[in-house]
């Protein structure tokens, strides 16, 4: 089942302006906390350029400065990219990955095709033989190919 991306996430709101200026999309944020420390994992993507190690190292420093100035607990920060066969986890990712080839499971088997267009509650899925409007609520699984 596809989730709706939580734009009320504190970390998202602290870093979205920076990543937006750099043409980098925030795909996912995971926060693990116990009493006074935690771990923040952020998955990033750009349609325009490759997020190489040098870029991610510089971006890590910038994000770390923002988060350390605003969060009241200690944490470690991990940045990563989505990988070749990423599972699509939120409605927002269908917009980000428009034009990309995916494997989609609606019933009990996968079908390959492309994300033609993303809409607020659905997306257009194109295979070799058809184009269909798919509601996010009907998606059992989806991943990049």
Curated annotation (Swiss-Prot):
Required for maturation of 30S ribosomal subunits. The gene is rimP. Pfam families: RimP_N (PF02576). It is found in: Cytoplasm. GO terms for biological process: ribosomal small subunit assembly; translation. InterPro entries: Ribosome_maturation_RimP (IPR003728), RimP_N (IPR028989), RimP_N_sf (IPR035956). It comes from the Bacteria. One of its GO terms (cellular component) is cytosol. Belongs to the RimP family. Keywords: Cytoplasm, Ribosome biogenesis. This is Ribosome maturation factor RimP. The keyword Cytoplasm applies.
């Amino acid at each position: 089942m596809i989730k709706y991306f939580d734009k009320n996430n504190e970390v998202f709101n602290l870093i979205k302006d920076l990543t937006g200026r750099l043409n980098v999309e925030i795909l996912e944020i995971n926060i693990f906390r116990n009493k006074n420390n935690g771990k923040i994992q952020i998955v990033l993507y750009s349609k325009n350029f490759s997020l190489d190690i040098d870029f991610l190292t510089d971006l890590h420093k910038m994000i770390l400065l923002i988060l350390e100035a605003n969060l009241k607990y200690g944490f470690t920060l991990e940045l990563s990219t989505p990988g070749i066969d990423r599972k699509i986890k939120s409605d927002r990712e269908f917009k980000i990955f428009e034009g990309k080839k995916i494997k989609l499971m609606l019933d009990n088997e996968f079908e390959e095709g492309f994300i033609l267009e993303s809409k607020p509650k659905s997306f257009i899925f194109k295979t070799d033989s058809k184009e269909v409007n798919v509601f996010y609520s009907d998606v059992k699984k989806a991943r990049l190919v």
